Amino acid sequence: MNLHVVFALAGTEYALPVGAVLQMETFAGATLVPGAPSYVAGIVTVRGLVVPVIDLRVRFGLPPAELTLDTRIIVTESSGRVVALRVDSAREVLKLDVEKHQPAPTVISERASGFVHAVHALGNRLLLLVDLPQILGETKHDQLPQLLADDGSKARPQLPS
């Protein structure tokens, strides 16, 4: 049994292992970053650290949504990088039996660009288990790793002494 954070996007429930989650909080907005990919909603400060926010609706090819009182960011860490995921809501942590995970049908994994790696049936609910490294572009060529890796060293030589 592993703990998972359950979150929703456009009425569909997804799950992410708790081990990848640092914290969850209400999302009130982010500072926009010029030139960032469309799925990067901007940056926020979390515990004194500037963190990029990925709008999972846009990343998954869904239409963007307005902010509501339920909108959350799930602050995650993968391969030493901290990233916040904007979701419609996140209110539940569940114990899921890993033995009951089923591979995502090909049509789902292809349509979801590999972001979903398994499905978990929980009573009459189906939870789509997300692949965080895939979302963060760690397993395919993507602009996001470069954005996350930039520590400001490129800009420093341009700053006046």
Protein language model regions, located:
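An acidic, low-aromatic, low-complexity terminal/linker signal
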Residues: 1-161
